[in-house]
A protein has these predicted regions:
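Terminal low-complexity "docking" segments
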Residues: 1-156
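Short helix/strand-capping turn motifs
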Residues: 136-183
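Alpha-helical context
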Residues: 56, 60-63, 100, 104, ...
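Extended amphipathic alpha-helical regions
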Residues: 124, 128-147, 161, 185-191, ...
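Alpha-helical oligomerization segments
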Residues: 177-231
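Generic, low-specificity signal for short hydrophobic/alpha-helical stretches with a mild N-terminal bias
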Residues: 102, 106, 110, 132-139, ...
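Surface-exposed polar/charged interaction patches
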Residues: 33, 46, 86, 90, ...
Length: 231
């Protein structure tokens, strides 16, 4: 496995990334969102690479920072993780950690074609503007840093979605803090897991989740009582 690029290389790639078209639709608050990406890279000599695929944004969940650090990204490499970790360390981005949006790359394809990258981007933007059903973006970025370009686009989409998502979550009281200073959404999720844990296998899964979330001690007595009953 190649070593991750330096911070300077990653941030330079992010700086070279340009979002040509961003979808008017936002990420769903109470459901999954399939985000279609089209990343164009100028290869020189009148050639460009077009990479297209889907990033699945899972239903936003209120999660602990401990869980986010280990579980937020699936199937992304070290460069993408490094870029997003730096972005999320900024004060104005901390809310993303609370939502724990999980991105999973899938259905990726690529092709090399002839043409001018700006003109092709304009044509693809016109097509995207006519597609009201999809959530998709058109991005121009360096060929060697696809995942960094994706993170630039995804972060911008998340930042636009946060106010709307937060409003809908707050209306249901899911952002309020409850037991152990945990958001009510986390407590509700764990309560549901306890109610559905009718076998030792499910109890083991619940125990792993509590440890992944970094909240095992908060529910320790309740968990061992459940485990005792199921044995």
């Amino acid at each position: 496995m190649p070593a991750p690029d330096s911070t300077n290389e990653i941030w330079y790639a992010a700086r070279l990334t340009r979002i040509v078209y961003t979808p008017p639709r936002l990420l769903e608050t109470f459901g999954e969102t399939n985000v279609v990406y089209n990343v164009l890279s100028d290869l020189g000599n009148g050639q460009l690479r077009i990479r297209r695929g889907v990033v699945k944004a899972a239903r936003p969940r209120i999660l602990t920072p401990h869980f986010y650090q280990t579980q937020m990204l699936e199937n992304f490499g070290d460069n993408a993780r490094s870029y997003l970790d730096k972005v999320l360390s900024k004060k104005d981005s901390l809310r993303i950690i609370q939502y724990g949006l999980c991105f999973e790359k899938q259905e990726h394809s690529e092709q090399t074609v002839g043409g001018d990258v700006e003109e092709v981007a304009r044509q693809m933007t016109a097509d995207a503007e006519d597609d009201f059903a999809s959530v998709q973006g058109i991005i121009i970025g360096p060929d060697s840093h696809l995942e960094v370009s994706l993170m630039v686009f995804i972060n911008a989409l998340v930042q636009r979605s946060v106010p709307h998502n937060a409003h809908e979550l707050a209306n249901r009281g899911l952002l309020d803090l409850g037991l152990g200073g945990l958001p009510n959404a986390v407590i509700q999720e764990i309560n549901d897991d306890f109610a559905n844990a009718d076998s030792l296998a499910k109890a083991d899964d619940l125990g792993r989740k509590l440890r992944d979330y970094g909240i095992f001690e908060t529910f320790e007595d309740r968990f061992y009582e459940l485990y005792r009953r199921l044995r």
